[in-house]
């Protein structure tokens, strides 16, 4: 069920991104924001590189957080973390009760993804999770569009949240800051784009 709801200017949003893939364990960082310009907290956990634990780890990270009852939306940087550790956004929504928005700078190349998944013994399972994430929708931006998937939230509400939180680029600030923190901690300095 995807619903639209009223957005307050200081809605609590959790943006999640991963760090560089330097080890078997990959750090994921969550930045808790009020709207798009006030950071309220930082969450951290680890997932297995190319594993299948991202959904469970993110669920636990959220549920164990002191911010859990305040978070109204989770924003993910794509659905693959730590290589091909795929997040099941429908399950993440069901387990936490918090709507999920997936943000992508460009439309995914599904043929390339399917080709890469052939090297995984559980590639079909990963592909099923990817398909379960649902339709990819284009959201126009000032300079360039972004692409989204969603669970438990209507597209009009997603557009409002994107507008509210995308204050320095077309990427929502909670996601941009999570990326900066994750790469900065692991690489010693932040780099790349969320």
UniProtKB/Swiss-Prot annotation:
Write down the Gene3D superfamilies for this protein, in alphabetical order: archaeoglobus fulgidus dsm 4304 superfamily (3.30.2170.10)
Q: Which NCBIfam families match?
A: PRK00766.1 (NF001977)
Can you name this protein?
Answer: UPF0215 protein Mbar_A0619
**What InterPro entries does the database record attribute to this sequence?**
Endo_dU
Task: Give the signal peptide range.
Answer: none
Organism placement in taxonomy: Archaea, Methanobacteriati, Methanobacteriota, Stenosarchaea group, Methanomicrobia
Give the similarity note: Belongs to the UPF0215 family.
Q: Name one Pfam family in it.
A: DUF99
* Cross-referenced HAMAP family: UPF0215
């Amino acid at each position: 069920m995807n619903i639209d709801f009223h957005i307050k200017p200081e809605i609590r949003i959790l943006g999640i991104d991963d760090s560089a893939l330097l080890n078997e364990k990959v750090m994921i960082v969550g930045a808790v924001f009020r709207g798009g310009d006030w950071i309220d907290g930082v969450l951290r956990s680890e997932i297995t590189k190319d594993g299948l634990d991202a959904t469970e780890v993110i669920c636990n990270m959220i549920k164990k957080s002191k911010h859990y009852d305040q978070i109204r939306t989770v924003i993910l940087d794509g659905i693959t973390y730590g290589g091909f550790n795929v997040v099941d956004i429908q399950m993440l929504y069901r387990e936490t009760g918090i709507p999920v928005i997936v943000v992508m700078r460009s439309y995914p190349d599904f043929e390339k993804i399917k080709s890469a998944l052939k090297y995984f013994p559980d590639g079909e399972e990963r592909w099923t999770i990817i398909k379960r994430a649902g339709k990819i929708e284009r959201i126009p931006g000032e300079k360039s569009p972004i692409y989204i998937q969603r669970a438990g939230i209507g597209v009009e509400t997603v557009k409002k949240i994107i507008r509210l939180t995308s204050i320095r680029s077309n990427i929502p600030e909670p996601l941009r800051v999570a990326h900066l923190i994750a790469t900065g901690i692991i690489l010693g300095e932040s780099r790349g784009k969320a």
